UniProtKB/Swiss-Prot annotation:
The gene is rplE. InterPro entries: Ribosomal_uL5 (IPR002132), Ribosomal_uL5_bac-type (IPR020930), Ribosomal_uL5_C (IPR031309), Ribosomal_uL5_CS (IPR020929), Ribosomal_uL5_dom_sf (IPR022803), Ribosomal_uL5_N (IPR031310). This is Large ribosomal subunit protein uL5. SUPFAM superfamilies: RL5-like. This is one of the proteins that bind and probably mediate the attachment of the 5S RNA into the large ribosomal subunit, where it forms part of the central protuberance. In the 70S ribosome it contacts protein S13 of the 30S subunit (bridge B1b), connecting the 2 subunits; this bridge is implicated in subunit movement. Contacts the P site tRNA; the 5S rRNA and some of its associated proteins might help stabilize positioning of ribosome-bound tRNAs. PROSITE patterns: RIBOSOMAL_L5. GO terms for biological process: translation. The keyword Methyltransferase does not apply. The keyword tRNA-binding applies.
Length: 179
């Protein structure tokens, strides 16, 4: 059973009861997942940017967008409009497919993994996790990687509080660390 159907059939009714909500539309749901990678070396090394774009597309199943510098920063040798990273925004079926792969396949492959931190919520029910290396994803092969790079993964939910967001993600199978 896919994560999307599991959400509709089991998670949503359970959250409706557990959170004491009156309407099905009040139940928190995942709106989008954003993968972001900042590349400091992209200003000087264009091959790093190309490799990163290819990796992000492989991981997400969607073409990555090049993020560019808004301002020139002389100390970092960056001019306005220079490529400095890449990001992917996932919605709909691709989002649920990525979340399922991330929770069930990628997270357990992290070295010394004891669960994700329950403190990474932003106060509005959105969760951000930093991944130190891209090799945890099964789509990435070790031979094709030139350097190990991390990324930020933000899960944006419609939850109004951190408690609702945590309840939603833990029902989806996110392994939170016990305090």
């Amino acid at each position: 059973m896919s994560l999307k159907t599991r959400y509709r059939e089991t998670i949503r009714p359970k959250l409706l009861k557990d959170l004491g909500l009156k309407n099905v539309h009040q139940v928190p749901k995942v709106q989008k997942v954003t993968l972001n990678r900042g590349l400091g070396e992209a200003a000087t090394n264009s091959k790093a940017l190309e490799a990163s774009l290819k990796e992000m597309a492989t991981i997400s199943g969607q073409k990555a967008l090049v993020t560019r510098a808004k301002k020139a920063i002389a100390t970092f040798k960056i001019r306005q409009g220079m490529p400095i990273g890449c990001s992917v925004t996932l919605r709909g079926d691709r989002m649920y497919a990525f979340l399922e792969r991330f929770i069930n396949l990628a997270l357990p492959r992290i070295r010394d993994f004891r669960g994700v931190s329950p403190k990474s919520f932003d106060g509005r029910g959105n969760y951000t996790i930093g991944v130190k290396e891209q090799l945890i994803f099964p789509e990435i092969t070790f031979d094709k990687v030139d350097t190990i790079r991390g990324m930020d993964i933000t899960i944006v939910t419609s939850a109004s509080s951190d408690e609702q967001g945590k309840a939603l993600l833990s029902e989806m199978g996110m392994p939170f660390r016990k305090k």
